[in-house]
Regions:
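Non-catalytic cap/lid and distal C-terminal segments of serine-dependent acyl enzymes
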Residues: 1-255
Length: 255
């Protein structure tokens, strides 16, 4: 077992126009400390938080560092506030910010740029971001794991949550069907463009309030001939489930 570096970073984001926090788990390969050896380029996962979470919650509520250590996987955890991983109408361009982070960490860290070495995962709102980036940035990620995902974005927009303003994301128009916020629309666009959609591993607990939304999205994948892997089983919309799910996702990513 190797040691893991836990990096808490604050850097000035050109996209957001202010300093942003970023948490990174990085395997400390022996080549990093020996100038006579060629440094190893690591596989990495972009891990997206949910609506009530941030860049620290996977570190605090799961065993993500131990799972990453077991498989020598770098984990990149950004913070996007309540943005829905979108370029907000009244707010910051968080979709573009995630793309900025991808480029930034691959420049400053010993991460492989090969598509087959890059993965993306996230829960709830982060699951929504996961499927959105899988469909629109498919050249970057070989595999994607949406966990307890919001596949029907209208549900996110209609959500009554503490200090959450969906109008900040969408503008005054609350109708998102057929827009870049609509995962079903993005799926159709990817299929029409003959995009090489990343392999999908969808997980959701049967007690989760989003379970039937997940089944509906899977039904659509079946109808459109898009391959995927699916696991459900017992589990609610909580970190007890996401701890198990992210472990399964990491094992699948590196197999």
């Amino acid at each position: 077992m190797t040691h893991m570096a836990l990096i808490t970073m604050n850097y000035n984001s050109p996209t957001i126009g202010m300093h942003q926090n970023l948490t990174i788990i990085l395997p400390e390969d022996v080549t990093f400390f020996d100038s006579s050896r060629t440094a190893k380029h690591l596989k990495s996962m972009l891990l997206l938080h949910g609506l009530s979470s941030d860049e620290t919650t996977y570190i605090r509520y799961t065993s993500i560092e131990r799972y990453a250590n077991e498989h020598q996987l770098a984990i990149i955890m950004p913070n996007v506030d309540h943005s829905g991983y979108a370029n907000m109408v009244y707010g910051h361009s968080y979709y573009d910010y995630i793309l900025e982070i991808y480029e930034y960490v691959h420049q400053i860290l010993p991460l492989s740029r090969k598509r087959e070495d890059n993965f993306i995962a996230g829960h709830s709102m982060g699951g929504y971001g996961t499927i959105k980036f899988a469909l629109t940035q498919s050249d970057k990620f070989a595999k994607a794991a949406p966990l307890s995902a919001v596949f029907e974005a209208q549900r996110l927009i209609d959500l009554d949550w503490i200090d959450f303003s969906p109008q900040a994301i969408t503008g005054r128009d609350s109708q998102i069907k057929g827009t870049e916020l609509d995962t079903y629309y993005l799926l159709d666009q990817a299929i029409d463009a003959n995009v090489d959609i990343p392999e999908l591993f969808i997980m959701c607990g049967k007690e989760d309030f989003l379970y039937h939304d997940n089944l509906q999205f899977i039904e659509t994948l079946n109808k459109k001939g898009v391959s995927y892997k699916f696991e459900d089983g017992s589990g609610d919309h909580d970190y007890a489930y996401w701890d198990r799910a992210i472990k399964r996702a990491i094992e699948w990513f590196v197999q």
